[in-house]
Amino acid sequence: MARHRIALALAVVSLLALSASAKVWYSMLWDGDSLSNTTKTKVLKHTFASPAAGARLNINVKLTAGTAVVRLTDPSGTKRYDKEFSAGRANIEETFKAPTGEWQMVVAFRNATGDYSVKLTGI
C-alpha cells in the first residue's frame, strides 16, 4: 500500500513539473509578414509568468529595400535589444535573463520591402 502511495505521489509531482515546463516552453510571442514599401510601427506585448527566468529573441529579416528597427524592453523597463536593419539578410538569436512580467517589442518599418519574423520565447 505504501508503495502505491509513493508511486502515485511521484506521478503527480512529475505531471506538475511537466505542466510547469510546458507552460514556459509554449509561452511565446510571434509575428511575421511580407512587406511592400511599408512604413508602420508595431508594438507587441507578452507576459511571462513564473518559472520563466528570461526570454529568447529570434529575428529573421530579409529586406530588399528600406529599414526595419527591432527594440525589446524587459519588465523592469531596461532596453535589452535595439538594432536597425537595412537591405540584406539577418538571423539573430539573443537570450536575456530578467524577472517575469510584461515584455514589450517594437518593430518599426520605414519604406521596407521584404520579409520578417520575430519570436520571443520564455525560458
Regions found by a protein language model. Name each.
Residues 1-8:
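Bacterial N-terminal signal peptides that target proteins for export
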Residues 19-49:
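Transition segment at domain starts
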Residues 109-123:
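Edge beta-strands of jelly-roll/beta-sandwich modules across compartments, strongly enriched
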Residues 82-87:
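Short beta-strand segments within Ig-like beta-sandwich modules, predominantly Fibronectin type-III
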Residues 48-63, 104-107:
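Hydrophobic beta-strand segments within beta-rich accessory/binding domains
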Residues 44-55, 94-99:
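Extracellular and analogous surface-interaction loops
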Residues 62-67, 111-113:
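Short proline/glycine-enriched turn/loop motifs at strand-loop junctions of beta-rich domains
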Residues 65-81, 120:
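Short, surface-exposed beta-strand/strand-loop-strand elements in extracellular ectodomains
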